[in-house]
Each structure stands twice: as structure tokens, then as C-alpha cells.
Amino acid sequence: MIVGILTTLATLATLAASVPLEERQACSSVWGQCGGQNWSGPTCCASGSTCVYSNDYYSQCLPGAASSSSSTRAASTTSRVSPTTSRSSSATPPPGSTTTRVPPVGSGTATYSGNPFVGVTPWANAYYASEVSSLAIPSLTGAMATAAAAVAKVPSFMWLDTLDKTPLMEQTLADIRTANKNGGNYAGQFVVYDLPDRDCAALASNGEYSIADGGVAKYKNYIDTIRQIVVEYSDIRTLLVIEPDSLANLVTNLGTPKCANAQSAYLECINYAVTQLNLPNVAMYLDAGHAGWLGWPANQDPAAQLFANVYKNASSPRALRGLATNVANYNGWNITSPPSYTQGNAVYNEKLYIHAIGPLLANHGWSNAFFITDQGRSGKQPTGQQQWGDWCNVIGTGFGIRPSANTGDSLLDSFVWVKPGGECDGTSDSSAPRFDSHCALPDALQPAPQAGAWFQAYFVQLLTNANPSFL
């Protein structure tokens, strides 16, 4: 369901060469698909756009050429190759290495007490900023272009959704270290999102690892790689959201064979992640779905029991601060009038949700859990959703409350933007390998590119409907 930043968009290798004018008539339009595995459509782009690799399943026609100055920055931070250091980010550990010795922590740790969002400024995701500057702004003018530039400066999380994305984490932390040495006090924000058989109840964001093909061991190597980076940059506070959708699927979707098969692997992998990343400079939040998913009365206690068990089975790690809600979703924080699509559930916003599940966590042995809530796409209420469970590229949405630790709520550590607005949730093309029917519903904006690809029309929608406004 949830899509992170699955791939680089704007400035990786250009795939399409110049096409004669007579052939342009059959080329894809700007923002259309122009390549990818099993793609049988046009592999060229209309005049004024260039075919750019996005992922193995998708290449996209982007405006202009990939050699602009704004694209150069993106290229320097989105390489698909491993970093040229002694660290290995591709080797798979032997099957027997299911538990590894916890290596020592680096010196100069950015420790904290209490709310980890207090006393630091979350870092604005440079990759997302490069997308906005190179993909969104060139086709905007006037006030919209100025507003888009302001969006690029809002702190948002970077998604580590493949092993190949870990060099981006390293580069980001290096940039933060430089900024902090020059007088800043920044913290890094990342999403750990690479479970084997990921997204078990949907199709749009299937990941790179399979349980049947050594996925658990590969995932542990992915976590080891992240840990090495975090230890190397132990002078920087690092804020992590752990595996969106995974545990929530274990609450409600075990009737789906893929989820039932993945249950033990999910729990083993998440235990490994929160144990290995239990570092003095780290604060972690397990993804906890949202009010319209686990906030229903029948789901609240089973969810709380599962989250508390994960916490206790990992020996109550200090760095596991609590839960993240509404990641990549659309619910308002404290709206007072329930939208029609929430009918039947008294827990119709995220504030009600965290105050419902917080005491239940304590009942099950996790008494000091706190929360963050994603408001990146929650600015317009009600949304255009026809059903509360409609999650893909929903119409009638806008950028929401800006990230801030000034929440006015004892359980909420911070408002955050976890989902970078403008990156697609999933394709509306029913012939695509990762097509999910939710992305072709009447309340999904269409036509939509592959998950993770830039969706200009959606970015414009979010910007137009933003509350507070950027205009």
C-alpha cells in the first residue's frame, strides 16, 4: 500500500535518443511511460521531453533534457551503485548468521532525553528538493512556482526502500555534518522500508527481496548497512520510521496468503531492525497504520498487543520511542466534523486514534510510547475519498500541517511529513506488473505513473489545496 521513494527519477541515465519527427506521432506524451520490463508501448517521448529511467519496471517522459543544473544535483545523490568505500552493501550474509554481534558505537553520539524532535531542526530531504526543482517547478509559473520552491524546503523523510538507496543516507548525513559544523543543529529523517515480501496485501510497492530467495538474510544485511552508517555518523541525531504497513497488515490481513506466509519473517526482521538500530543517537517509530485502519474498535486492542509484543520481544529498546501514524495517508489530525466516509467509527482523526491506542499499549506492557503523525497530504478535509480505505493517489487532497514538535499534545512528539508529496502511490495502468486496482478507482487521480515516479498533476493538486497555504 504504501510507497516510499522506490527509485531515482529526474537525472539517472537518459534512455531515449533523438527520434525523427514522423515517429514522434507515436511517442509517449510528457509524464507518460516510455520503458520498463514488459512494457510494450512507445519507447520515445514527445518533443520537449526525455525518456528517463525510474526503475526496472518504469521509465518516464520528463520535461526537457537531463543535463540541467538542477538535475546535476539529483544525479549526485541518486546513484544506483554502492558507495566507493570499504563498506559492503551488496554481500549477503550466510544463512546461519541470523543474530550478529552488536558492534561498538562511535564516539560523539548525539544523545537525547525525552522528545527526540526537540532541540534539533529536521533536515529537508535533498532528493525530494531536487525532484521539486527539476521536475515540478519548470512547468509552473508565477506564484505556483514560488510556492513549489517553498515546499522543497519543508523537512520530509527520505525512504530507504532498496539497498541501493543506503548511499543516499550516507550522503545526507555527511551533508548534515557539514551544516552542523557551520552552526546548524540538524537531524536526519529516514524510512526503513525493505522487508522481504513487502506490501503483502497490495501490489503497488512490492520490494526487492523475496522470503523464498533468502530475503530474511538479505534484509539483515540491509539493516547492518544502515547501522554502520548511523554509527559512523553518531554525532547526528537520526529519526527513523520502521517498515510502513508491515505490522498493520499482520493485524488485519492474515487472511491474505502472502501476509500469512510473511508473518514470521516480518516479525523476525523488524525485531532485528529495532535491536540493531537501538543506538544512542537514534529514535525509532514503528508504523502503526492510521485511524481508518487500526482505529476501528475491533482492531485497536489486537494492534496494541502486537506493537507491545514487538517492543518487549526486542528487550524494550530505549531508542524505540513509539509509533508513527497516518504515513502516506490523508487523515486530519484534529478535525471536529467526521467525514462521511468515516461513518461507524468514533475514532475519525489521528488525535483520537493515538489517544485510543496509547492506553492499550500501556495495558500490554509498553507504558512510555509516544507518537508522530504524518500530515504531509492531510491539509484538505474532507478529502475526495469515497471509501476510507481508498489510499492510492486520492483526489481532493492538499499539503497539510508543517512539521513541528510544538504539537500541544502530551502523546504526540511531532507533526511530520513522511510521504514526499508528488511521488506517485501506484500506476493506474491495468497492464502494468505492479498495478493495484485501488489506483484505478473513481477517487484516484488518473492517469498515474508507477509507484515512486514523479506525478506532476498530483503535486499541483497538493499545492493548490495546501492548508496552511503556500500561495
UniProtKB/Swiss-Prot annotation:
Region (Catalytic): 107-471
GO cellular component: extracellular region
Signal peptide start and end residues: 1-18
Chain positions of site Not glycosylated: N38
Catalytic residues of the enzyme: D245 (proton donor)
Outcome following mutation: D199A: 20% of wild-type activity
Residue stretches of biased makeup (Low complexity): 64-101
Residue(s) carrying Pyrrolidone carboxylic acid: Q25
Broad enzyme group: hydrolase
EC number(s) given by UniProt: 3.2.1.91
Compartments reported by the entry: Secreted
UniProt propeptide residues: 19-24
InterPro entries, alphabetized: Beta_cellobiohydrolase, Beta_cellobiohydrolase_sf, CBD_sf, Cellulose-bd_dom_fun, Glyco_hydro_6_CS
Linker, as annotated region: 66-106
Site (Transition state stabilizer that also modulates the pKa of Asp-245 and may act as a proton acceptor through a water chain): residue numbering on this chain: D199
Residues carrying covalently attached carbohydrate according to the record: T111, T121, S130, S133, S134, S139, T146, N313, N334
Keyword list, A-Z: Carbohydrate metabolism, Cellulose degradation, Disulfide bond, Glycoprotein, Glycosidase, Hydrolase, Polysaccharide degradation, Pyrrolidone carboxylic acid, Secreted, Signal
Protein function: Exocellobiohydrolases (CBH) that catalyzes the hydrolysis of 1,4-beta-D-glucosidic bonds in cellulose to release the disaccharide cellobiose. The degradation of cellulose involves an interplay between different cellulolytic enzymes. Hydrolysis starts with endoglucanases (EGs), which cut internal beta-1,4-glucosidic bonds in cellulose to reduce the polymerization degree of the substrate and create new chain ends for exocellobiohydrolases (CBHs). The CBHs release the disaccharide cellobiose from the non-reducing end of the cellulose polymer chain.
Domain notes: The enzyme consists of two functional domains, a catalytic core joined to a carbohydrate-binding domain (CBM) by a serine-, threonine-, and proline-rich, highly glycosylated linker sequence.
Family the entry assigns: Belongs to the glycosyl hydrolase 6 (cellulase B) family.
Annotated PANTHER family: 1,4-BETA-D-GLUCAN CELLOBIOHYDROLASE C-RELATED, PTHR34876
Other remarks in the entry: T.reesei produces two different exocellobiohydrolases. They are unique in that they can hydrolyze crystalline cellulose in the absence of endoglucanases.
Name used for this protein in its record: Exoglucanase 2
Name of the gene: cbh2
